[in-house]
């Protein structure tokens, strides 16, 4: 079954991309901090205008930038703002060990198959099956967005940004 894309992606010049991402933040009901499955959607509206949205328990955060990185930087800034969220939301990032996700401010869109969640200041780790939590997708095939979009996907995959 194909995933329903948000309404805002209907009028873009290029196909939208959707991925699930791991988030870490406080449950509004219980107050417990935990790992969440979030969603990131981005689309090249034109070759120089990228619109991105991150969805999670906090709702939707959207930004537009000249590149995927610029839009993502703006959203991370909002999620990490301690005046808006206490504690700030974090997105899990892959570290130098390919099987470990650390709490960080960057996004890794292509997960490994098994991972530990490493919480700063604690020795205990929570082991999660990332493939069960996230669905890795093949790199989409584009006409020409160009190569920037393909390169961005590869950058996310290789460097865990």
Model-derived features: where do they sit?
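General beta-strand recognition
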Residues: 51-53
């Amino acid at each position: 079954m194909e995933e329903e894309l948000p309404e805002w992606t209907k009028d873009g010049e290029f196909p939208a991309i959707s991925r699930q991402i791991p988030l870490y933040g406080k449950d509004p009901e219980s107050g417990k901090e935990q790992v969440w499955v979030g969603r990131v959607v981005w689309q090249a509206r034109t070759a120089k205008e990228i619109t991105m949205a991150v969805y999670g328990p906090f709702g939707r955060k959207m930004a537009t930038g000249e590149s995927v990185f610029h839009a993502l930087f703006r959203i991370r800034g909002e999620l990490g703002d301690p005046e808006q969220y206490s504690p700030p939301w974090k997105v899990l990032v892959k570290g130098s060990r390919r099987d470990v996700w650390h709490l960080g401010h960057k996004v890794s869109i292509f997960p490994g198959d098994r991972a530990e969640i490493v919480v700063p200041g604690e020795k205990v780790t929570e082991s999660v099956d990332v493939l069960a939590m996230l669905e890795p997708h093949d790199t989409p095939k584009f006409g020409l967005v160009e190569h920037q979009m393909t390169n961005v996907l590869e950058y996310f995959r290789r460097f865990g940004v």
